[in-house]
């Protein structure tokens, strides 16, 4: 296991809080940086995040603060939503140390630029020469706080850094594998959210288990095509950040993106769904970015196109899914 180190988790949402708890339980000196002073005080006094993880106790050694000075720690976990990452980094770059180790825990593709979180970080903090890694995989925050067995993957272009960080994050109920395919791991984490919306829509329409199984399988193939076109390794999508995360988010109702699809399939409007969720469903904006990316890369992406039609063209879910079944027949 790794030596005990000083860590800042940037972002006090459900996943940032869970990772902070995990690292504190591992004996590391951990502070969560967040914007809400009331939530920070509650974490420090009651050892609970009442906004995102109510009723789930946090390790009492986990501290919370609104002081950006903690961003100067040698290891910073970025738990900032993808669409907010660029402006957040630009506004806080002055607090990071040169050579800081950054572990991205967000999932998504930036709209407009179509950049991954790794690319955003390189563009905004390149002058600091940060050491970058990404952590992804099938991992609901609440299950991590309950100490339920979880396995994830941590990717870094620096193989030695990946091996080191997997030791930092791993614990009795949290197993961390390492990889060097940063692109594949980040693409898998982003793409599966689109497929989760599609799977939820199928279930919201009551189309049955056969439909869901077909969608998950063809969704994995689409994820792999898009990822490889973007520079990823195909086999990464058969791992935890691909198939693993896809399976979890397409089948479990704790998934916010699946919830969006379920409610769309039952006839609710997107605006009402997103307003009532209370948390970010990254797949909604990621769908627009992936749809544009597929067009630019000339990659066939029928499921992404279908979800885009439902979200952004107000196409009726039954019509969209009927159109998918009516596509020209082909080899698998």
Curated annotation (Swiss-Prot):
Keyword Magnesium: no
GO cellular component labels: cytosol
EC code: 1.1.1.94
Pathway per the UniProt entry: Membrane lipid metabolism; glycerophospholipid metabolism
Catalytic center residues: 192
Superkingdom of source: Bacteria
One Gene Ontology MF term: NAD binding
Keyword Lipid biosynthesis: yes
Matching Pfam families: NAD_Gly3P_dh_C, NAD_Gly3P_dh_N
Protein name listed in UniProt: Glycerol-3-phosphate dehydrogenase [NAD(P)+]
């Amino acid at each position: 296991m790794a030596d005990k180190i000083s860590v800042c988790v940037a972002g006090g949402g459900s996943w940032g809080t869970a990772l902070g708890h995990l690292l504190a339980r591992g004996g590391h000196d951990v502070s969560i940086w967040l914007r809400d002073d009331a939530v920070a005080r509650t974490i420090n006094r009651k050892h609970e995040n009442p906004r995102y993880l109510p009723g789930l106790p946090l390790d009492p050694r986990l501290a919370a603060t609104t002081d950006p000075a903690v961003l100067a720690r040698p290891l910073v976990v970025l738990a900032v939503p993808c669409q907010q990452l660029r402006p957040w980094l630009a506004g806080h770059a002055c607090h990071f140390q040169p050579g800081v180790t950054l572990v991205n825990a967000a999932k998504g593709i930036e709209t407009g630029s179509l950049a991954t979180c790794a690319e955003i970080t390189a563009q905004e903090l390149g002058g600091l020469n940060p050491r970058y890694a990404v952590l992804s995989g099938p991992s609901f925050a609440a299950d991590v706080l309950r100490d339920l067995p979880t396995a994830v993957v941590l990717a870094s272009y620096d193989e030695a850094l990946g091996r080191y960080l997997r030791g930092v994050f791993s614990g009795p109920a949290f197993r961390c594998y390492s990889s060097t395919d940063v692109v594949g791991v980040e693409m898998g984490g982003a793409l599966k959210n689109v497929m989760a919306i599609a799977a939820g829509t199928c279930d919201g329409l009551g189309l049955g288990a056969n439909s869901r199984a077909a969608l998950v399988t063809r969704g994995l193939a689409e994820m792999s095509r898009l990822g490889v076109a973007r520079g990823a390794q195909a086999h990464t999508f058969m791992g935890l950040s691909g198939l693993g995360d896809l399976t979890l988010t397409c089948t479990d109702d704790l998934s916010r993106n699946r919830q969006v699809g379920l409610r769309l399939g039952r006839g609710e409007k997107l605006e009402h769904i997103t307003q009532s969720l209370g948390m970010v469903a990254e797949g909604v904006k990621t769908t627009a970015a992936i749809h544009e990316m597929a067009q630019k890369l000339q990659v066939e992406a029928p499921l992404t196109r279908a979800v885009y039609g439902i979200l952004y063209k107000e196409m009726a879910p039954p019509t969209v899914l009927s159109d998918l079944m009516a596509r020209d027949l082909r080899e698998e």
